[in-house]
Amino acid sequence: AAPREWLHVLGVSQLTWAVYLSAIQRGIRANVNEEFTVSFDSASPYMMAGRFQQYAITPHISGNMDDWVLRHQLLPMGYAVANAKKTQPFPQSSPVANKLSLQDFNPRRGQFDVKTTDDLSDEVLCNHNVYVYLRAFRDANEAVFKRDGVAAQELKDACSFIESLFAMKDWQSALELRKESLQAILNREPVSDIDSDIER
């Protein structure tokens, strides 16, 4: 049979899962198939913008697992925001959102407008969220796999172990011995209320 070259995982929004999947890819490439790819997707950036009008907050990746979470905040909206006399900047930073103010996100300024945002606002919010997620996944991987990465040693050791599984003959026994500690690391990463709603 032809070798399998791609594994895609649905619905990954946790940074720890992102680095675990990278460790799997590294282990397979080093020991089984150097062309193998592990990928994943996440609907959260789009659902946050479209359903919840939430913007993603860039996490501060550090050695503290409490920092390894993608948090979200409600976009300031409404008549008062749309008609504010002083231009207010967008609360977070991303290439597209940096060019717009909160008033740009709220172009409908009528007293009786039920919704002060529009379709362009939703699209820009999606763009911002996707950027924050992608950057966070990249930063998380660098924190674990770069020589001077700032991730907790426990997480680095876990990823190193995952990589090593693909060189073991009796990997099942090794994984059985470590599975609870691997799961414990995943359980320590906070999950925001929005992600909890999405998962339900």
PLM regions and their residue ranges:
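C-terminal extensions of enzymes
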Residues: 71-200
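Glycine-rich phosphate/ribose-binding loops and adjacent secondary-structure elements
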Residues: 1-104
